[in-house]
């Protein structure tokens, strides 16, 4: 039997319905400011998608575009101005940044309460300490996608392949909050296929097309493919399609985690607006 398809579009629409319901009870409109440097085609497309979705929800969204050679100090000055602007709830600087700009310095410059990407060290610390904060959108999207399809993570053996600061590490923290038993595997993990075969839930986020084959996957596992790799004009995941022969459920690429990342960004923007005004989400 073919694996169940875990559609990110369906789960994302449920998130948007919740956001719309919450917005109806508010006396203000959340505001999102996105900064993009240069004209990298992927960045242009991602920013356009985020702005379009924000506007569709009724947010006040604005994209600021600067030349790729914008000095780092000029970018930091603009972020400082947006931090001080009471009309702005969320700030997002589209990554990757040009080589002359220190990404970590930029991420640390964004006020933690306006950090809708969830990358500020204070928010990272809150994630791991069990506190309230704004957390990275893709890991949030993975957890929300699993919950949408009724996956109870408590006590589950979950293996995350990939230890990036954007996906793997924060996802491990979020899964621990759900009482999962988490293994964080990576390129130096010995006998990676043996480790992945233990997983009841397997999440792969390494950026290597079709790395995971069906022999790597436990019969009846739930598999989440975070990878998006462009190969000869096609988008391929990190998981080979043959995994559908053994998995119970599998996210597609595209159409799986991607839509959830944007949905959780919209959720973070609302949370930022509420946290900044009331200190708690409503």
UniProtKB/Swiss-Prot annotation:
Entries under PROSITE patterns matching the protein: THF_DHG_CYH_2 (PS00767)
A single Gene Ontology CC term: cytosol
Pfam family, one: THF_DHG_CYH_C
Keywords from the UniProt entry: Amino-acid biosynthesis, Histidine biosynthesis, Hydrolase, Methionine biosynthesis, Multifunctional enzyme, NADP, One-carbon metabolism, Oxidoreductase, Purine biosynthesis
Pathway: One-carbon metabolism; tetrahydrofolate interconversion
InterPro entries per the UniProt record, alphabetical: Aminoacid_DH-like_N_sf (IPR046346), NAD(P)-bd_dom_sf (IPR036291), THF_DH/CycHdrlase (IPR000672), THF_DH/CycHdrlase_cat_dom (IPR020630), THF_DH/CycHdrlase_CS (IPR020867), THF_DH/CycHdrlase_NAD-bd_dom (IPR020631)
Protein function: Catalyzes the oxidation of 5,10-methylenetetrahydrofolate to 5,10-methenyltetrahydrofolate and then the hydrolysis of 5,10-methenyltetrahydrofolate to 10-formyltetrahydrofolate.
Protein name listed in UniProt: Bifunctional protein FolD
Lineage: Bacteria, Thermotogati, Deinococcota, Deinococci, Thermales
